[in-house]
């Protein structure tokens, strides 16, 4: 049942029992992963002095959107629970570890890191509170091993999606990655694409940027490229049950992409005969976008017009990006999002997207 209120000021998160689709625990360090590595990789980590793997597109040292009052708010499961889940009255929270694992060149090291991180998440986070859910880290550098990792966690429904980043080694629609999507679709995992870059390639069509702020704003191009690739290469027609969640992508750019891709498809569809319907229809059926950070107008009426161009209220999923700071009070429903859709965005859409997620009413 969707939540509707007369005044947005009355709508506090605690009244919704929301599911937060983008919460960040701290990234694991060597001492965290050692218990979950075999002897070979423990020796390798020590000899190569591998400790903490930052994703260079979002280095922890800069922390441009870190809340000063929440520096250690995600240090462990208990602290995250107290600072976020309890404070906001959340029904569940999806934990996303975005780290340098996504950028490791060695496919075997990446496989070991993903497996160890998943075990660490399961034992040190998911086991500590039944409201925690998580994204499964799999090595896109080694698709066969990634599919095996998905199979390994098929019966652990605390893991609800498979995670990668928006700007990786190649477009995600390539057949190289299809074993990952086949395993994910088979077991009800969504595919989650988070803002971030492995810097395998320059993040812009003109080369590398000079400043972090430039890298931040071109992330949207990375998301747009992946949407186009997944549609055009036929992933969504091959795996019709697969949902794709765009994390920290923004929202307002997608309607224009849907219109343009459908327009150009009408003239060039001879190249992709497996696409039998307009790309805009496929995108509305398969893609979902998280609400934080929202790139629309701060006025609710104007924001509703922008969201209306999606032509599908089911495409938005509630998120906070905690503990990152986007300049608003997390305890109150976001001003830019229509209050009439609060229940739809914060619960209904989440449950219909994540087939593996079960929560009490």
Predicted regions and their residues:
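Active-site flanking residues adjacent to catalytic metal/cofactor-binding acidic residues
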Residues: 19-21, 193, 247, 320
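Acidic-and-aromatic substrate-binding clefts and catalytic sites of carbohydrate-active enzymes
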Residues: 71-75, 102-103, 139-146, 168-175, ...
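Active-site loop-helix segments enriched in His/Asp/Glu that coordinate
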Residues: 100-126, 144-152, 170, 174, ...
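Short glycine-enriched loops at secondary-structure junctions
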Residues: 99, 140-142, 195-201, 322-324
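Divalent metal-dependent hydrolysis catalytic cores, especially in the metallo-beta-lactamase
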Residues: 18, 63-70, 82-107, 131-139, ...
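Catalytic pocket-lining loop regions of alpha/beta-barrel enzymes
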Residues: 125-133, 149-311, 315
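Aromatic- and acidic-residue-enriched segments that line the glycan-binding/catalytic groove
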Residues: 31-43, 108-113, 146, 202-208, ...
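Mid-to-C-terminal alpha-helical segments outside catalytic/metal-binding sites
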Residues: 2-19, 27-92, 119, 123-127, ...
């Amino acid at each position: 049942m969707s939540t509707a209120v007369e005044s947005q000021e009355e709508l506090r998160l605690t009244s919704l029992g929301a599911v937060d689709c983008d919460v960040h625990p701290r990234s694991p360090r060597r001492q965290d992963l050692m218990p979950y590595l075999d002897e070979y990789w423990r020796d390798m980590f020590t000899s190569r002095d591998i400790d903490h793997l930052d994703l260079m597109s979002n280095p922890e040292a800069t922390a441009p959107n870190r809340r000063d009052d929440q520096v250690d708010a995600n240090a462990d499961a208990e602290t995250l629970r107290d600072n976020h889940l309890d404070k906001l009255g959340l029904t569940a929270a999806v934990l996303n570890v975005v780290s340098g694992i996504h950028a490791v060149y060695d496919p075997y090291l990446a496989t070991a890191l993903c497996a160890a991180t998943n075990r660490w998440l399961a034992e040190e986070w998911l086991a500590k509170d039944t409201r925690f859910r998580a994204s499964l880290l799999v090595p896109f550098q080694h698709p066969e091993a990634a599919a095996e990792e998905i199979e390994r966690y098929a019966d652990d429904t605390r893991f609800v999606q498979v995670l990668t980043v928006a700007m990786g080694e190649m477009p995600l629609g390539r057949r190289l990655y299809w074993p990952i999507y086949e395993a994910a679709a088979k077991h009800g995992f969504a595919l989650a694409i988070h803002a971030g870059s492995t810097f395998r390639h320059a993040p812009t069509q003109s080369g590398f940027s000079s400043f972090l702020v430039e890298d931040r704003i071109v992330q949207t191009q990375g998301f747009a490229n992946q949407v186009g690739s997944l549609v055009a290469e036929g992933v969504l027609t091959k795996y019709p049950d697969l949902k794709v969640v765009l994390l920290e992508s923004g929202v307002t750019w997608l309607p224009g992409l849907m219109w343009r891709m459908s327009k150009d498809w009408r003239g060039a569809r001879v190249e992709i005969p497996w696409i039998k319907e307009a790309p805009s229809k496929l995108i509305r059926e398969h893609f979902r976008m998280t609400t934080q950070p929202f790139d629309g107008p701060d006025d609710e009426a104007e924001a509703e017009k922008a969201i209306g161009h999606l032509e599908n209220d089911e495409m938005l999923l509630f998120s906070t990006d905690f503990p990152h700071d986007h300049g608003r009070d997390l305890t109150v429903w976001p001003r830019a999002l229509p209050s009439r859709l609060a229940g739809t965005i914060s619960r209904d859409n989440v449950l219909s997207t994540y087939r593996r997620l079960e929560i009490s009413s």
